C-alpha cells in the first residue's frame, strides 16, 4: 500500500485520468473528491462489497486494494 500525505486542496493523480482531491478534514473524517472518466467505477468500499455480494461474486482484490 502506498501511503501519501496531502493537505486540504491538494490533489493526487491515479494514472492519467483520475484525480483525488482532499476537500476538507474535520476530526477523524476526511472529505475527498474524485474525478474519473465515466467508464471508471468509483465506490466506497462498503458499497462495492454490497454490489459484489448482490452479483454473487467475490472481489478479486483484498478489501481496500481496489
Swiss-Prot record:
A single GO molecular function term of this UniProt record: mRNA 5'-UTR binding
Domain of life: Bacteria
InterPro entries assigned to the protein according to its UniProt record, in alphabetical order: CsrA (IPR003751), CsrA_sf (IPR036107)
Pfam families associated with the record: CsrA (PF02599)
Keyword RNA-binding: yes
Subcellular location: Cytoplasm
GO cellular component, one term: cytosol
Keywords tagged on the record: Activator, Cytoplasm, Repressor, RNA-binding, Translation regulation
GO biological process: mRNA catabolic process; negative regulation of translational initiation; positive regulation of translational initiation; regulation of carbohydrate metabolic process
Family: Belongs to the CsrA/RsmA family.
Complex formation: Homodimer; the beta-strands of each monomer intercalate to form a hydrophobic core, while the alpha-helices form wings that extend away from the core.
Function: A key translational regulator that binds mRNA to regulate translation initiation and/or mRNA stability. Mediates global changes in gene expression, shifting from rapid growth to stress survival by linking envelope stress, the stringent response and the catabolite repression systems. Usually binds in the 5'-UTR; binding at or near the Shine-Dalgarno sequence prevents ribosome-binding, repressing translation, binding elsewhere in the 5'-UTR can activate translation and/or stabilize the mRNA. Its function is antagonized by small RNA(s).
The protein, known as: Translational regulator CsrA
Name of encoding gene: csrA
Amino acid at each position: 500500500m502506498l501511503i501519501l500525505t496531502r493537505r486540504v486542496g491538494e490533489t493526487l493523480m491515479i494514472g492519467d485520468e483520475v484525480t483525488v482531491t482532499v476537500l476538507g478534514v474535520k476530526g477523524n473524517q476526511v472529505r475527498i473528491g474524485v474525478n474519473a472518466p465515466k467508464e471508471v467505477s468509483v465506490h466506497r468500499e462498503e458499497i462495492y462489497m454490497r454490489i459484489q455480494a448482490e452479483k454473487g461474486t467475490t472481489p478479486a482484490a483484498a478489501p481496500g486494494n481496489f
